[in-house]
Amino acid sequence: MNGFFLPRRMGRTALLRYAALLDGQTVNLHAELPAFVTEAETAEIVLRRGLRRHRRPARVYPDLEGPWLMDAAVLLGAEAGGVPVRRGRWKLSLEVRSGRRSVRLPLTLTEPTTPRKGATGPMARSPLTAQRYRLGRTVRGDARVVCTRIRPAAEVAAVHVQHARIDVDLRVLGVRATAPWAEVVAAERRVRCPLAEVQPGVWRLEVPLSEMVPAGGGREHWDVMVHPGRGAPLRLARRLHDVQAPRRVFTMRKILVSPRRGVLMRIEPRYTAAGNFRFACADGDRAE
């Protein structure tokens, strides 16, 4: 359908040359305005869904060798101080004003922007709320932002590795944490742990090292499950980032501790390939 509508609309819409959501919550736009726009004083990006409208400023300027151009960066999400968009599809348009005259232009997206590959990449979700936004287009080629349901998650905020202690700060997203608590879970063992709120929305887990000594002097892996107080438990992970090689970038030092009298244990906090947070515990006398 795009192949039918787009040729007939060229010259009457603002053509997006760049459109991307890089940090999971900011829409970056660069567009070429139609030739009939020869002057402009102010401009705004308009997000529309049904009767709801949200406006954010845009920059328009003349190109020395071509049509007028537009740049805009639109932050999404009330929690981030941005546009309070909710679930649904929000159509994007550009309103240009000059004196008392104004014109509203559809923002046409012919091809989605392909981000460059590098050490970082586009984020699929907002780092603050885990809300998922994506750029799409209608059958007529109009650009739109699609806001979908938040998937509940437990996200690592910080890991404090000390001489003989490890604390983990975490956030619970997408579900209300009424009275959260955590469990560290190995193959055949579970240890319940309290969580203390150290900042609004940030909870701290004091890792129970004395309960995590490997049985039989072997090696054990412990995952962390967070119980938000309602709903299913959430596996603690770190996924809200733009790093392409997180296991290499987010490495943490291993420490040798004596959680019990006469017992040595080597413990290493780490991330799995899927981003799950895990502790690898081994006998301190045998581990390298």
Language model: regions and residue ranges:
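Basic, ligand-binding patches in group-transfer machinery
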Residues: 1-288
